[in-house]
């Protein structure tokens, strides 16, 4: 299966998603339920466009080499510096082909087999986290359960379930505070204080990653809370209209974190060249979400392998043509903003 065949197979299988040749947010706009962004739908488009505006500085005067795309992270070795991002409420947003449990049962082992890992989603149905953690446990802990910012008791319960899976890291998408189903809950859910996050990070038992950081101030608070990593993310434009693109804020966040935590970024990253750009701007790794949904719906495990190898080959090609033999060699002067 090649990528064009994957897209063709996915069309008509994903509810309102059209499995576009380029997943740039324009066709789905503000379609929620569905894969679109909130309100005007322009934040997802801005995410994509921002990476297009970063250009690559080609330099082929160097020794011949085979690029080393491997990433060392939290005691694990990955084939590539990118991960499948967390996606949930599959039936609501993508039709009835897969529910969350079925989706994760395909995604988690397929990512592990491809040499990367999947962040898994969470939901109001307890079976979502149960299914995700079961899939991670069955694959040697090769996955990152992502817990929503529920009330403290619910967070503690779900994190305990996540730890039992043997996961190598655990995440919370704090930006999910903007999702309607988390608002007006009793007990309160959504935003967390630094003190609450400190407690969650202490109780995690494994490296704790906080997803949904969009300002230098927010990054500093996350570091003060003791997180092992942050994800620069605006939730794919699905929680706050008119916010900036992740690429636009990444450099200032990297600067303030200053190596005290790992920095991931997502939002509109669609090619291996985009992965390279993110690393050149200071990210340690990236998350890719919507395209992995298309991969699962279009080809199951084979689709996940197809997309992963496509992104990996593009990354290696970019490294070769910009003079970076390994990820550590990717530097700011290799891109033009």
Which positions does each model-derived feature cover?
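Generic secondary-structure signature for well-ordered alpha-helical cores
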Residues: 49-57, 112, 116, 164-167, ...
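An N-cap/entry alpha-helix motif that binds or orients negatively charged groups
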Residues: 2-79, 330
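Conserved active-site and cofactor/substrate-binding residues in soluble primary-metabolism enzymes
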Residues: 38-46, 102, 106, 153, ...
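Conserved active-site-proximal phosphate/metal-binding subdomains
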Residues: 1-26, 237-262, 270-337
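Alpha/beta enzyme core
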Residues: 108-109, 137-138, 150-265, 272-296, ...
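N-terminal functional module of multi-domain proteins
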Residues: 43-129
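Flexible, glycine/proline-enriched loop segments at strand-loop-helix junctions
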Residues: 94, 119-121, 143-150, 182-188
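Long, hydrophobic, well-ordered secondary-structure blocks that form the structural core
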Residues: 117, 127-153
């Amino acid at each position: 299966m090649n990528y064009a065949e994957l897209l063709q197979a996915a069309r008509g299988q994903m509810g309102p998603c059209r499995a576009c040749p380029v997943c740039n947010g324009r066709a789905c706009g503000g379609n929620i339920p569905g894969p679109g962004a909130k309100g005007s739908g322009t934040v997802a488009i801005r995410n994509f466009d921002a990476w297009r505006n970063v250009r690559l500085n080609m330099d082929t005067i160097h020794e011949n080499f085979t690029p080393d795309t491997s990433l060392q992270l939290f005691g694990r070795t990955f084939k590539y510096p990118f991960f499948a991002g967390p996606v949930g409420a599959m039936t609501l947003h993508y039709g009835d082909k897969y529910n969350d449990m079925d989706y994760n049962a395909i995604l988690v082992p397929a990512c592990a087999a491809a040499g990367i890992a999947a962040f898994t989603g969470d939901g109001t149905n307890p079976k979502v986290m149960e299914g995700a953690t079961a899939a991670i446990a069955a694959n040697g802990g090769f996955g990152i359960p992502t817990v929503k910012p529920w009330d403290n008791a619910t967070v503690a319960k779900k994190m305990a379930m996540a730890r039992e899976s043997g996961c190598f890291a655990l995440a919370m998408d704090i930006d999910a505070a903007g999702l309607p189903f988390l608002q007006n809950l009793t007990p309160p859910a959504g935003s967390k204080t630094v003190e609450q996050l400190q407690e969650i990070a202490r109780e995690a038992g494994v490296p704790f990653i906080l997803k949904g950081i969009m300002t230098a101030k927010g990054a500093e608070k996350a570091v003060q809370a003791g997180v092992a990593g942050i994800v620069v993310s605006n939730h794919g434009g699905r929680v706050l209209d008119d916010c900036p693109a992740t690429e636009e804020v990444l450099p200032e966040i990297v600067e303030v974190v200053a190596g005290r935590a790992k920095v991931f970024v997502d939002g509109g990253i669609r090619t291996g060249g985009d992965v390279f750009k993110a690393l050149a701007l200071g990210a340690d790794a990236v998350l890719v979400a919507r395209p992995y949904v298309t991969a699962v719906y279009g080809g199951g495990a084979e689709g996940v392998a197809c997309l992963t190898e496509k992104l990996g080959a593009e990354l290696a090609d970019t490294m070769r043509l910009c003079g970076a033999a390994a990820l550590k060699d990717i530097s700011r002067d290799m891109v033009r903003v």
